[in-house]
Amino acid sequence: VNQFEQRILQVTGAKAISNIETLQTLWGGYGALLRVSLDGGLYRSVITKQIDLPDFSEKEAHPRGWDTQLSHARKLKSYQVELTWYKEFASLCDENHKVPLCLDSACEGQSMMFILEDLAALGYPNALSLPTEAAIYAGLSWLASFHAHFMNVAPKGLWDEGTYWHLKTRPDELAVLQDQSLKQAANDIDLLLTKNKYQTLVHGDAKLANFCFSTSHQSAAAVDFQYVGRGCGMKDVALFLSSVLTFEETSQHVETYLKHYFRELTSSLEEFQPSLDAQDVVTTWMKLYPVAWADFQRFVKGWSPDHWKINPFTESLTEQAISLLPALKRELLLRR
């Protein structure tokens, strides 16, 4: 039994490890996610995230050519942020925004390891590559509860600005962006999202693949907290929808998803933030929904101009946001 396996046995009280399965390798060759099956002790299985931080020169090449010192530094910091999330914040989450608890973590030199609860063993066995209606609603309910709970919480040890695509962290993609009206609007879009008065913690990478679902898909739990930090909840909603829509839905259909999110947000705010005006949060964020989508579009169009997420639906939302910018700046930035 090696040192790593010994630690798992110690933390879980298991007698032996019966199987180790690689679930996935991490983006860019930074490590692996493993399911470790156990005999005896408190847990049938745990998930370990093992991260080996290479020097910049040793990394695997990015398939789109976006290999820069900045992207490498962002990735390294993201694992430190995730460590902080699991040590300081994960235990604050409740069943309505379920996350795995961290049973143990270790950081030595260029290597890090988290031992996490296995969500599959806790009633969330389903990872989906294609969404169901129930899963879409469950993911939005998770986000609403999470955003309400962490409203106005300081992102201590997390990203000062959550998400992996925000403007300050993506100068290279902005430089090559061909859409001039979006390029000119980028600063105002960013300003509205970061300076409106309702800031929460955002998951930062809330795509479908980062959720696990119950057998019925009625409830969700989330993983992968590398880009968690301060932000407007609409950023998570835009990214989540970008990962579940076919972009052939009617606008009324998408509207039902948004209504569901805002209904859940209202009831969660009443629970977690009774002193806040929930209706004002909803009104403000509703106006920022197209702005958050335009913000993501700015990244995608610079990063991969032929990406399938660039389509009439997302272009129309982006144009809508750009046309609303002057009025929204007057309304949302002056009344703080």
Where are these regions (language model features)?
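Conserved NTP-binding catalytic cores of kinases and kinase-like/nucleotidyltransferase enzymes
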Residues: V1-G109, S214-A220, L334-R336
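All-alpha amphipathic helical-bundle segments outside canonical DNA-binding/catalytic cores
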Residues: F272-A292
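ATP/Mg2+ or Mg2+-diphosphate-binding catalytic cores
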Residues: M286-R336
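ATP-dependent phospho-/nucleotidyl transfer catalytic cores
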Residues: L122-H203, C212-T215
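Short, glycine/acidic-rich hinge or "gate" loops at secondary-structure transitions
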Residues: C102-A106, V153-H166, F272-Q279
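Active-site acidic catalytic loop and adjacent metal/ATP-binding pocket
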Residues: A32-L38, L42, I47, I189-K235
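Active-site activation/catalytic loop segments of kinase-like enzymes and analogous catalytic loops
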Residues: S71, T84, R230-E271, A292-N311
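Conserved short submotifs of the Hanks-type protein kinase catalytic core
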Residues: S111-L122
